[in-house]
Amino acid sequence: MATQRVTRNSQQQNRISQGSNSRQTSLLDWMVKDKSGNFKSVLKESSSVEDSTRTDDRTEGALQVAVGYFQKGPKKASLSKDKVLEKHLTTVENVALSNGLAPEAIDILLNVALSGKFGNAVNSRILKCMIPESHISEDSVLKAVSWLCVDKCSGNTKVLFYRWLVAMFDFIDHKKQISSLYGFFFASLQDDTLCPYVCHLLYLLTKRENVKPFRVRKLLDLQAKMGMQPHLQALLSLYKFFAPTLISVSLPVRKKIFFNNSKNLWTSASLAVRLRNQGAFPEPLNLPLRPTTGRSLKRKWNSHSVIPALNSANKEYGEKTASLFDYLSSERSLPLEQLQRFPQLLESIHCLELPSQMCSVLNSPLLLHYINCVKDESILLRISYWLSQALQEECVWYNINNYEQEKEFINFLDLVIRVQCFLQEGFYSCEAFLYKSLPLWDGSSCRSQYLQLLAWIPFSSFSEVKPLLSDHLAPLFFTSSIYFKCSVLQSLQELLQNWLLWLSTDAHVQPTTDSPLETTLGGSMSSVSQLIEYTGWLCVVAMRLESSSTLLLHFILDFYEKVCDIYINYDLPIVVLFPPVIFHSALLSLDATILNQLCYIMYRYRNNWTAAKKNRYLQKAKPEFSLSSKICKEYNYYLTAMVCCLWTSRPFKAGVYTDPETIENTGGTQYKSTLNIVYHPSLLSYAASFLLQESPEEMTEHLSSIQGKKWNWYLDYLYSEGFQGLKLFIKSSVHSSVPKPEENTE
């Protein structure tokens, strides 16, 4: 590796000596480019030199003088004694904070800071003001890394450089050569001081081909030496994600925050520069160049400014635009700005290069199609990492009493939700955002967005998700309106569907006969069952609070309509019934659609149960996969109760005693028939309408006349009115051996 590094450094020096063709630019070249107007200036990109003011000219000149001083200045100087040094350093800081620095200026100042030409205090201040105006050249980073090899700078300067490199990672125009230095960065893990920041950088650089057995062993040795450090767990978790067979130690299934970014020196400053250059702020912001006390920058939220524009990583400024045919006939990558239509994506998919700022793909449906095709896990990891910073570090709307920017933030969340729906995958960073902000949520602001984020929580053990639901969401659920309760139940139904889709896909990818997967699948089924049971508990409490509301019961049965078909629709060995309170509330409901939906759910439960019993695999599987006899008895009880009530007019079990005085108070003596399909409270209007349709001249005909042939005609009438659930239930559960009710059913 040393030979490769020397060769690379010599090649870089040759490129520097070539002048205009080099990306590494000397101060003289930079000044010439500034005067010619063909390249970016130090302050900002300007299309016309004539429109610049005298103040801008003076600032540009002062910055050029300051950068020239640092490039050729004294090797050692003291800030307290050298006023010229302080003056030039202040100039660089002011320009960096107001408009950012051009790539050429960053290239020069990085070399100054890491070459050890000045003291630690000066080097630290230079690194803290390395805020890019647009992008950072990859060659500048490579040259800076080469200074680390000769050990010219102090340990504190190295730490600050790695922190800067992580913060500015998405601003680097190329990363191919930086990725080739993966081994060098990995070797730097030996330094205990650098280890957390190098782990963070490696987390951003790691791809599947970087995961090697010797690196896994090294990380495990470091963990044994240093303990369960979050940064080591992050890298090990990523390695296990790419190569699960190489790591057998137990790791946290999901840690909400691996890296602490709350003391990032450059994030808010670089964002403010970008917003100002885009016209979001009329005046420069006064931002400190030192760690803050944890308070985020209170700025106007603008989702269009937070998500950077889509720019190619390999775009060269001033390059003549080429046609699509030119890129297809060569090995060059197609600039993303030329990608406008889906046919172009299909034609150029082999020569497409994703942007360096990966978060910019959120605004591009075409690139989201591309991400879905390539299935590169590192892409989703980079997007999730950026979302983690954007949601956890910069979103302060939920902990301050200021909702003026709620609309802009809602638009941003809607965009994130649309991306998750398109990719059919939830981001862990969004779940971490829910854990952080849900305790402060009032249940009203961004309600739709919050509940949609809840529906996209990635699959995990229910014990990890339950605190989010029981500790924070349940109190809001119980104390809010019925409409909020219905919305939460809808979100839990979508969450269940997303989990089932993920599990069914994963189960088909790997064979279910291997013992390790059986254990995993058994735990997964347990998590799904616990989610259904917890939702059932919420439903029972909500029914009591809302006095068995029909609207609420509709949403509850919609949820169990999804539950009853799990085995057939998703091929997962699980059958979970609704609680008795839900069953009896639906059976005795005054709404005919509720009764019809209950009949359909019971019919689907029967089909799933029958299919599960016929499955040979379940019969030979371990006990954790066998269908519970308790569930079987419970289903038979529900089935018997429905048939007895709706068909045989025997709603009570033998041996059940009811006080006759209580029956008399109900106003009816034929209590046994009060719940059949003729006298059921939800079907009385249909029975009366049927009699009027059959015998319009006899206005006094009694409901008891519906028997014999009329009974069958009445059933056909109900089926014609849309009671398909009732039709399926009767045809599947009621047989000819069951006697039809006679005129006197007492």
Swiss-Prot record:
GO BP? centromere complex assembly; chromosome segregation
- Entry's localization field: Nucleus; Chromosome, Centromere
Keyword field: Centromere, Chromosome, Nucleus, Ubl conjugation
Keyword Nucleus listed: yes
Posttranslational mods: Sumoylated. Sumoylated form can be polyubiquitinated by RNF4, leading to its degradation. Desumoylation by SENP6 prevents its degradation.
**Chain intervals for the UniProt region annotation (Disordered):** 1-24
The principal localisation class reads nucleus
For whether the record's keyword set contains Transferase, the answer is: no
Q: Which domain of life is it from?
A: Eukaryota
User: Gene Ontology terms, cellular component aspect?
Assistant: inner kinetochore; nuclear body; nucleus
One of its Pfam families is CENP-I
- State the oligomer form and interacting partners: Component of the CENPA-CAD complex, composed of CENPI, CENPK, CENPL, CENPO, CENPP, CENPQ, CENPR and CENPS. The CENPA-CAD complex interacts with the CENPA-NAC complex, at least composed of CENPA, CENPC, CENPH, CENPM, CENPN, CENPT and CENPU. Interacts with SENP6.
Sequence similarity: Belongs to the CENP-I/CTF3 family.
The record describes the protein's role as:
Component of the CENPA-CAD (nucleosome distal) complex, a complex recruited to centromeres which is involved in assembly of kinetochore proteins, mitotic progression and chromosome segregation. May be involved in incorporation of newly synthesized CENPA into centromeres via its interaction with the CENPA-NAC complex. Required for the localization of CENPF, MAD1L1 and MAD2 (MAD2L1 or MAD2L2) to kinetochores. Involved in the response of gonadal tissues to follicle-stimulating hormone.
Spell out the protein name for this chain. Centromere protein I
Where does this protein come from, organism-wise? Mus musculus (Mouse)
Recite the lineage of the species.
Eukaryota, Metazoa, Chordata, Craniata, Vertebrata
